[in-house]
């Protein structure tokens, strides 16, 4: 790409901010970002933990090791992905994580014609196994899969989940932007279609009824609905995530409810 993908612009936000927010919604748990030492990052939510990878050039297993060590003892399952997946959907993250059970150590999508080790779920305890592989110079994820229990999910198996089939029927969650042309093509596509609703004072001010808008963040949804998203307004995503953070990413099918905070709804 020629530049860090983390800070690439994405519909008024950045690729990393979007990825962090989508993963957080899909796992309902802590989020860890692994970066090169000193790598500048775009603004992230305060509860996101940033860990430095002090051993660059060892490939994806090294990054996995750092992230899994951070979550070992904190989470039972970790969804691990790259930052360059602009169409990643919360339903995809949830589908992969929820497929993990006591019989497996890894849930590996084998979809869109490829294994997807950077869109997969791992047991954090695998960090020690990965360290052994790195020490032996075995740097490919395939070496890890050879020594642990892997549940492989095909396209059909992934889409057996109704929520994912409805939200992302072609599994575009797995699309990467590896080249400048990929990024330009992705940027040219419209933002996700979401529903916007207003209640309380906002509804009485001429914004009554649900409407469909194109928006990748809460702020852009408010703008599309001709609302001023300031400290007087709160937003709820799908009725359960209440926030004043306008950078919160949205995905196709979301419903955003805006309420006047001063009026208490």
Tell me what each language-model feature is:
Residues 137-140, 198:
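Core catalytic alpha/beta fold that binds nucleotide/phospho-ligands
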Residues 157-192:
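Glycine-rich phosphate/pyrophosphate-binding loop and the adjoining helix
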Residues 94, 128, 142, 183-184, ...:
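Generic structural signal for individual residues within well-ordered alpha-helical segments
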Residues 5, 172, 206-210:
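Short, solvent-exposed beta-strand edge segments and adjacent coil->beta transition regions
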Residues 184-264:
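Ubiquitin-like/PB1-type beta-grasp interaction modules and other compact soluble beta-rich domains
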Residues 1-138, 146-171, 260, 264:
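Nucleotide and nucleotide-moiety/phosphate-recognizing core
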Residues 124, 180, 239:
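Residues immediately flanking
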């Amino acid at each position: 790409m020629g530049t860090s993908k983390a800070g690439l612009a994405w519909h008024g936000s950045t690729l990393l901010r979007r990825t962090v927010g989508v993963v957080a919604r899909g796992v309902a748990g802590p989020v860890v970002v692994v970066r090169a030492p000193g790598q500048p990052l775009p603004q992230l939510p305060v509860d996101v933990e940033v860990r430095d990878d002090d051993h660059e050039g060892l490939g994806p297993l090294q990054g996995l090791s750092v992230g899994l060590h951070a979550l070992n003892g904190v989470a039972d399952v970790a969804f691990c992905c790259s930052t360059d997946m602009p169409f990643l959907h919360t339903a995809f993250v949830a589908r992969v994580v929820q497929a993990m059970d006591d019989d497996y150590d890894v849930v590996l999508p084998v979809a869109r014609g490829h294994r997807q080790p950077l869109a997969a779920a791992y047991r954090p305890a695998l960090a020690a196994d990965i360290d052994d592989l790195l020490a032996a110079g075995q740097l490919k994820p395939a070496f890890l899969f050879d020594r642990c229990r892997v549940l492989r999910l095909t396209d059909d198996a992934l889409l057996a989940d109704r929520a994912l089939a409805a939200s992302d029927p072609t599994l575009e969650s797995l699309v990467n932007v590896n080249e400048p042309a990929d990024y330009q093509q992705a940027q040219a596509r419209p933002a996700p279609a979401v529903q916007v609703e207003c209640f309380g004072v906002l509804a009485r001010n001429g914004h009554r009824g649900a409407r469909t808008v194109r928006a990748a963040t809460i702020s852009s949804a408010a703008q599309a609905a001709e609302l001023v998203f300031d400290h007087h307004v709160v937003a709820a995503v799908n009725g359960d995530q209440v926030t004043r953070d306008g950078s919160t990413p949205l995905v196709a099918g979301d419903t955003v409810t805006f309420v006047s905070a001063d009026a208490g709804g």
